[in-house]
Amino acid sequence: MTSQQAHAIPDVQNLNDSRKLAIDKVGIKSIRHPVRVSDKNGGVQHTIAVFNMYVGLPHNFKGTHMSRFIEIINGNEREISVESIEPMLREMVKRLEAETGQIELTFPYFINKSAPISGVQSLMDYEVTFTAEIREGGAYTFTMKTVVPVTSLCPCSKKISEYGAHNQRSHVTVTAQTNSFLWIEELVQLVESQASCQLYGLLKRPDEKYVTEHAYDNPKFVEDMVRDVAGLLNAEARIDCYRVESENFESIHNHSAYALIECDKRLVVGAN
């Protein structure tokens, strides 16, 4: 196809739209691409992220150019790093002639953990989502979301039972908008410190005894979990606003217990 023939193909997306309704987000979802993420120990993890990429569409455009999203994600390097997200986002907004844009990437992240007694090491995986956003006026924000699996033990069950107490695996999800760099490991450790007990990939018998007894000594309702985590998030100056959720997959019910706290510390008098 000659360049003259290419120019003759109609560009429907650039046509005016008579409905005059702007679209908040339009783009592509669920595209997989390699990424590399630096870890706190000085290493680099190579993993696969699922990307969502959106821009705001002005009311006068009929559609956006979907192929440009793919060009942008493949344009600069084979692997995308955390450091390259903001430049990529700004390029996306510019090329698509938008005022707002958002890139989300979700990936598994691994932390090497030592069992509490034997010291045997194993990997634990955590689901992490980075969200980079440009809002009207060009303001840039970065949000990190981490799902941390932990153990919770019911205080009521412990109180009313002659022996034992029901416990279960729980997911504590923290979504934090940051004003400066925060390691994934720091957010994970913050959450795990407030659980009845943290989880490990590998445990020997002395370790299993320890985690069972540790959970029994630290019973927590789902309400306790979000309040205790929120207290530490309030004290973390690098976090401007957050959402903390806890879902307990109840071992004696066929439903989950759930609690949530949201806070924009910039609006709270006396906050850091």
From Swiss-Prot:
Pathway: Cofactor biosynthesis; 7,8-dihydroneopterin triphosphate biosynthesis; 7,8-dihydroneopterin triphosphate from GTP: step 1/1
Disulfide bridge map: none
Any Pfam family: GCHY-1
Reactions mediated catalytically: GTP + H2O = 7,8-dihydroneopterin 3'-triphosphate + formate + H(+)
Marked site (May be catalytically important) residue numbers: C154
EC number(s) stated in the UniProt entry for this protein: 3.5.4.16
GO molecular function per UniProt: GTP cyclohydrolase I activity
Keyword Translocase on entry: no
GO biological process, one term: tetrahydrofolate biosynthetic process
Keyword vocabulary terms for this entry: Hydrolase
Keyword Hydrolase: yes
Family that this chain belongs to: Belongs to the GTP cyclohydrolase IV family.
NCBIfam families: PRK13674.1-1
General function of this protein: Converts GTP to 7,8-dihydroneopterin triphosphate.
Protein name: GTP cyclohydrolase FolE2
Name of the encoding gene: folE2
